[in-house]
């Protein structure tokens, strides 16, 4: 291809119809012409299509330290759990990327993870942040809604359907996703006596979960619900899906204490009881999970167990202020949109944290506590002219005093006087 001489006449771009004197360059092919403007436009179109055709999802695997750094942006504390999770996830996806002909015949098995910790300690947030960091589909399921085949409730395949939906029905993407199953402790067998008839929400569900945890090709109804004859099913391979199982496991500390008191030389039951709860949970072993009610086969499919600590006042205060999506930052931004400055005193943050601990809701309950304190302010301030600053004190959180409202001159404003 070449550029025609400028003295050529009646030459036009075959695409846009512009004359050669209307463009900078006119390039000729076999009986056709294209101008520089159309070349640039075509180049942009090709680049966009190539970008769209590139597979989404995990492209470059971050190192455990990089995963840890991302978790630190959103999850405060729980250092041991985050480190265990970062290593487990890195090894899992390293295994996924290396699948193929294996010359040394070493088979790398899945590394599903169990997160054990009280309500509001960050189990779900850890799993969500992992999926976001790795740019893979993510789905959450509640184990209490699952039943074994033949009973009213959700089949375990419906867990996979949620992941497929999160991947916009792209099976290749879904097969590299993460599924978080919450309340896994609720499907524990109610007795260690294996001769007892299986209960609908207990051992039977564990048995049903075994295959998809290990890796199998599952048939999933595209509309959810039970399978029906002549129904077209979606096939999905679960071999490379990472399962993160979460549960509070209330009472498992007593199981661990019994084991420490009976089996560890030099420990009596009274000595074992001296451990605080978090220290006890650090001693958790697979046999403790079995004593709690998980069957050995199920425990074997989840080789990595990470313990999350109970969040104290200082940890909850950090959660309120430090993460990128910290609640204090969010509410401050919301009032800022109404040209109002929002401040929380340190005592207010402590009061919020103490109230969450008292309610036994952990970090999960922080938002509702702040919402209770701010609901009237967020209702009144948008229609108030004089208020430019709101200060939340400990008395506000404890329902003893209204928030402090200030005008532009720094004068304390009575709330009733500002209402429209």
From Swiss-Prot:
Family as reported in the entry's similarity comment: Belongs to the ClpX chaperone family.
Which residues participate in Zn(2+) binding?
13, 16, 35, 38
One GO biological process this protein is involved in is: proteolysis involved in protein catabolic process
Q: Quick one: which gene encodes this? A: clpX
UniProt keywords, alphabetically: ATP-binding, Chaperone, Metal-binding, Nucleotide-binding, Zinc
Molecular function terms in GO for this entry?
ATP binding; ATP hydrolysis activity; ATP-dependent protein folding chaperone; protein dimerization activity; unfolded protein binding; zinc ion binding
Record protein name field: ATP-dependent Clp protease ATP-binding subunit ClpX
Q: What does this protein do?
A: ATP-dependent specificity component of the Clp protease. It directs the protease to specific substrates. Can perform chaperone functions in the absence of ClpP.
One cellular component term (GO) for this entry is: HslUV protease complex
Describe, as the record does, how this protein assembles with itself and its partners.
Answer: Component of the ClpX-ClpP complex. Forms a hexameric ring that, in the presence of ATP, binds to fourteen ClpP subunits assembled into a disk-like structure with a central cavity, resembling the structure of eukaryotic proteasomes.
Report the residue ranges that make up the ClpX-type ZB domain in this protein.
1-54
């Amino acid at each position: 291809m070449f550029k025609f001489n400028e003295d050529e006449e009646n030459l036009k771009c075959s695409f846009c119809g512009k004359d050669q004197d209307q463009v900078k360059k006119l390039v000729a092919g076999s009986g056709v012409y294209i101008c520089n403007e159309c070349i640039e436009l075509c180049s942009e179109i090709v680049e966009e299509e190539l970008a769209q055709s590139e597979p989404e999802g995990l492209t470059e695997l971050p190192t455990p330290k990089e995963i840890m750094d991302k978790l630190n942006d959103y999850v405060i504390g729980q250092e041991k759990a985050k480190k265990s999770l970062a290593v487990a996830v890195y090894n899992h996806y390293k295994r996924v990327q290396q699948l193929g002909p294996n010359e040394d015949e070493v088979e790398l098995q899945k590394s599903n993870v169990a997160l054990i910790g009280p309500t509001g300690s960050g189990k779900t947030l850890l799993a969500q942040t992992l999926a976001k960091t790795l740019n893979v589909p993510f789905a959450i399921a509640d184990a209490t809604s699952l039943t074994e085949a033949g009973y009213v409730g959700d089949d375990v395949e419906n867990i996979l359907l949620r992941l497929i939906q999160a991947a916009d029905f792209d099976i290749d993407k879904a097969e590299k996703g993460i599924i978080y199953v919450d309340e896994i402790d609720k499907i524990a067998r109610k007795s260690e006596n294996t001769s007892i008839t299986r209960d609908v929400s207990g051992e039977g569900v564990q048995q049903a979960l075994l295959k998809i945890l290990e890796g199998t090709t599952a048939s999933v109804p595209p509309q959810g619900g039970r399978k029906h004859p002549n129904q077209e099913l979606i096939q999905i391979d679960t071999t490379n899906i990472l399962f993160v199982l979460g549960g509070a496991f209330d009472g498992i500390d007593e199981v661990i204490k019994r084991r420490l008191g009976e089996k560890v030389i030099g420990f009596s039951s009274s000595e074992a009881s001296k451990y605080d709860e978090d220290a006890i949970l650090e001693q958790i072993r697979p046999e403790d999970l079995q004593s709690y009610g998980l069957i050995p086969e199920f425990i074997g499919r989840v080789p990595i167990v990470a313990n999350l600590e109970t969040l104290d006042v200082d940890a909850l205060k950090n959660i309120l202020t430090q993460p990128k999506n910290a609640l204090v930052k969010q509410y401050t931004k919301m009032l800022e949109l109404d040209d109002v400055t929002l401040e929380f005193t340190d005592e207010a943050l402590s009061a919020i944290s103490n109230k969450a601990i008292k309610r036994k809701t952990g970090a999960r309950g922080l938002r509702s506590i702040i919402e209770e304190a701010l609901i009237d302010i967020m209702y009144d301030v948008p229609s108030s002219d004089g208020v430019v600053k709101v200060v939340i004190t400990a008395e506000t959180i404890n329902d003893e005093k209204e928030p402090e409202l200030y005008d532009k001159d720094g004068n304390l404003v009575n709330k009733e006087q500002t209402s429209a």
